[in-house]
Structure formats: C-alpha cells, structure tokens
C-alpha cells in the first residue's frame, strides 16, 4: 500500500506532491505549491523549499536555519482553509494551519501565504500571521474556539 501524501489531500504521495517536489511537474497554482512546500518540510527537503521561494527573498541564506529546524520539528498535519488569486491570476494567497511538535511541545502555524507567478512558475513570497482571540472561532474550520483547537 502506498503512503498518503503528508499534505492532507487523502491522495497517495506519488500522485499528489511527489511530482512537484522531485521536479517532474510545476505546481499549477498556489495551493499545490503550498501543499508541496509543506511536504518538503515533512521530508526535510531544503533544496525544494529554497527553489520555490521567490529569488528576491534570498532564501539560499536560510539553508542552515532550515536544516537546523528539521532536526527538532515533527510536522503533524496541514489544513488549507482558503485560497484565492489576484492581479489577473499572478498573485495568489493560501491560508492554512500547519501543526507540529517541537521540543516536546505542540504548536501550530496559522498563516496567509502570498505567492507570485513569474514565467509560468509559482513562488512563495512571504506570509502574514493573523491574530486570533482565544474565544474566536478557530480558522481551521473545526467549529471549536481557537483556545481549544489550534491556539493550544
């Protein structure tokens, strides 16, 4: 039996993010790039993360930091809860929750990532981390309060 993709799509990894991470295909949209980048974190693939960061971001300088982070972070799951495009389809946004453990503590990254399409290729630019009140509904869509879900 084949392994399911870590991106949470419920599709086999070989049919989902693998072709993007291994350069067999180019991610067709920001959501696929976001999911494949999450897989690269899970698989500890700094090369793919750097390759898919926009060149203006200078991501190659972050290689040592990325690799160091791999050693003590275990990724637990990804939930994409929104994606949209702007500027004629050349700028995209993906909002997600990525759960992890680090140093024995569970955490979550909640981010709205920004992507740019240049020469037929999508690149990660940056992300913003919205602030949520403890009693706000969790953005992951669970129906729980933030403090009882991703805010723990």
From Swiss-Prot:
* Name used for this protein in its record: UPF0225 protein YchJ
Q: Which NCBIfam families match?
A: PRK01617.1, PRK01752.1
- Mind telling me which InterPro entries this protein's record contains? NTF2-like_dom_sf, SEC_C_motif, UPF0225, YchJ-like_M
Q: Which family does it belong to?
A: Belongs to the UPF0225 family.
What does the organism's lineage look like at the top? Bacteria, Pseudomonadati, Pseudomonadota, Gammaproteobacteria, Enterobacterales
Q: Which Pfam families does the record match to this protein? A: SEC-C (PF02810), YchJ_M-like (PF17775)
Superkingdom of source: Bacteria
């Amino acid at each position: 039996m084949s392994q399911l993709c870590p991106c949470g799509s419920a599709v086999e990894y070989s049919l989902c993010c693998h072709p993007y991470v291994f350069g067999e295909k180019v991610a067709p949209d920001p959501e696929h790039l976001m999911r494949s980048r999450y897989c690269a974190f899970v698989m500890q693939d700094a090369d793919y993360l750097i390759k898919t960061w926009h060149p203006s971001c200078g991501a190659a300088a972050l290689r040592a930091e990325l690799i160091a982070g791999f050693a003590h972070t275990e990724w637990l799951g990804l939930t994409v809860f929104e994606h949209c495009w702007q500027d004629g389809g050349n700028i995209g946004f993906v909002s997600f929750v990525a759960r992890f453990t680090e140093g024995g503590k569970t955490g979550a990254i909640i981010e709205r990532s920004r992507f740019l399409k240049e020469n037929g290729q999508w690149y990660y630019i940056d992300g913003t981390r919205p602030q949520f009140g403890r009693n706000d509904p969790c953005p992951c869509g669970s129906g729980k309060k933030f403090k009882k879900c991703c805010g723990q």
